[in-house]
UniProtKB/Swiss-Prot annotation:
Glycans are attached at N179. The keyword Iron-sulfur does not apply. It comes from Sodiomyces alcalophilus. GO terms for cellular component: extracellular region. This is Lipase A. Optimum temperature is 40 degrees Celsius. Thermostable from 20 to 50 degrees Celsius. Belongs to the AB hydrolase superfamily. Lipase family. Pfam families: Lipase_3. Keywords: Carbohydrate metabolism, Disulfide bond, Glycoprotein, Hydrolase, Lipid degradation, Lipid metabolism, Polysaccharide degradation, Secreted, Serine esterase, Signal, Xylan degradation. Glycosylated. InterPro entries: AB_hydrolase_fold, AB_hydrolase_lip/est, Fungal_lipase-type. Optimum pH is 8.0. The gene is lipA. Lipolytic enzyme that possesses both lipase and acetylxylan esterase activity. Also highly active on the acetylated compounds xylose tetra-acetate and oat spelt xylan. The active site is at S219 (nucleophile), D287 (charge relay system), H381 (charge relay system).
Length: 416
């Protein structure tokens, strides 16, 4: 069954995005203790040309995941979008656990580093390298997920919960996650995906033991990739897991972010070559999602950020900056460096700071100023080297409302 989303649905998503942005303005009103995150050490510098190319390639790869549940991705590695740009990949499987916001969608592929026999002469990918790739798709309504879906944080443990057949970690973890909380909706999405992803990866790791694991995700998929990476590294001991996310929302509290920084050694600062980072969190100018859910709900950002400073497409090497710390004020944080630390169980106290603002929000909506340019904010979350989210050849022939192009919001379709 194919469903064509209607214009009001997309408008509703934009309005939810506005509400989320509006909530960011109340971070300073929270009554919880403010804990300083890792600070920026100096002015960000551009990435190297090689790192730029590597991240750009992954943005095209994660764009392909939007074909899953739409027109499809099929073996050996074909789709209606950019699959022909990856002649060295073979598809292992796709998954789609359902249509609810807590469900997950994506693909697992193997990059053999050399073109497939069916790729044809002249087909090559100079950036290809041997790897097992797991790509997590985003959602067309991430803001709905953030606001409406189980936003109450829950306790986080870095190994499978009893619900997932776990009880104790398989070994004494080298890092502890004390008093960590996680967005329960994002965790539910990973729990749905892990039933498919982990068994497949265990088989592939036996088949290709020398291939590292590369996780990539956009939007909600970035949040799921983060939780997947922590479990793979800590619980399963897969140290060769490297992560790249685009427009990743905040997933947990300050303690969880500190934990991730330690696991992926993001707290080394300038001691680490940016190209050697094993967690790359890519953000884009004016994209509000990396700052959501807001800090007054007990959420924070972690390190590893690379910031696309140019608003319009396409960016150049000089536009992609290496950020420092968790909240580099030269990057997506833009001065919003305070992170509210809300211990497990104290969510209601933090949320109570918002209750008095409900009437103010209702009164403010009729006077939304046109200068906010809501469509530009919506597109900013899609614009990561390319405009992501359309399963069409070349990614975005209609430009989706960019300067000089016609909007094509009505053309999205998805399978139910």
């Amino acid at each position: 069954m194919r469903l064509a989303p209607q214009k009001p649905l997309l408008l509703s998503t934009v309005l939810h995005l506005l509400l989320s942005i509006w909530m960011l303005g109340f971070a300073s009103l929270a009554g919880a203790t403010v804990q300083e995150p890792l600070a920026a050490s100096d002015t960000p510098k551009p990435v190297s040309a090689a790192l730029f190319s590597s991240i750009e390639r992954l943005s095209r790869l994660v764009d392909i995941t939007y074909c899953v549940g739409n027109t499809g991705v099929w073996k050996p590695f074909a789709c209606a979008s950019r699959c022909n740009e990856f002649p060295t990949l073979t598809l292992e499987r796709t998954w789609r656990t359902g249509i609810l916001m807590s469900d997950s969608c994506g693909l697992i592929a193997v990059d053999h580093g050399t073109p497939r026999h069916d790729a044809g002469e002249g087909k090559d990918d100079p950036l290809a390298e041997k790897a097992i790739i797991v790509a997590f798709r985003g959602t067309y309504s991430l803001t709905n997920t953030i606001i409406d879906l189980s936003t109450i944080p829950q306790e986080y443990v870095p190994y499978p919960s009893p619900d997932d057949g776990g009880n104790e970690p398989p070994r004494e973890p080298s890092h502890r996650c004390d008093n960590c909380t996680v967005h329960s909706g994002f965790l539910a999405s990973w729990r749905h995906a892990r039933k498919v992803v982990l068994p497949e990866l265990k088989v592939l790791r036996q088949k290709y033991p020398e291939y590292p694991i590369r996780l990539v995700g956009h939007s909600l998929g970035g949040a799921v990739a983060m939780l997947a990476a922590l479990e793979m590294r800590v619980s399963l001991g897969w140290r060769d897991t490297v992560v790249t996310t685009f427009g990743e929302p905040r997933v947990g509290n300050r303690q969880l972010c500190d934990y991730l920084n330690a696991v992926f050694e993001l707290n080394l600062g300038d001691e680490m070559d940016p190209a050697e980072r094993e967690y790359r969190r890519v953000t884009h100018a004016d994209d509000p999602v990396p700052l959501l859910p807001p800090a007054e709900w007990g959420y924070s950002s972690h390190g590893g950020e690379f910031f696309i400073s140019k608003k319009d497409l396409p960016p150049s090497v000089e536009d992609v900056l290496v950020c420092h710390g968790d909240h580099d004020e030269n990057c997506i944080a833009r001065g919003k460096s305070s992170a509210v630390s809300v211990p497990a169980g104290d969510y209601d106290d933090a949320l109570s700071t918002l209750e008095e603002q409900d009437v103010m929000l209702a009164d403010a909506l009729p006077w939304i100023p046109a200068r906010l340019k809501l469509w530009e904010l919506f597109f900013a979350h899609r614009d990561y080297f390319w405009r992501l989210g359309l399963c069409v050849p070349g990614g975005d022939p209609a430009n989706w409302g960019r300067k000089g192009g016609e909007g094509a919001a009505e053309s999205i379709s998805a399978e139910g």
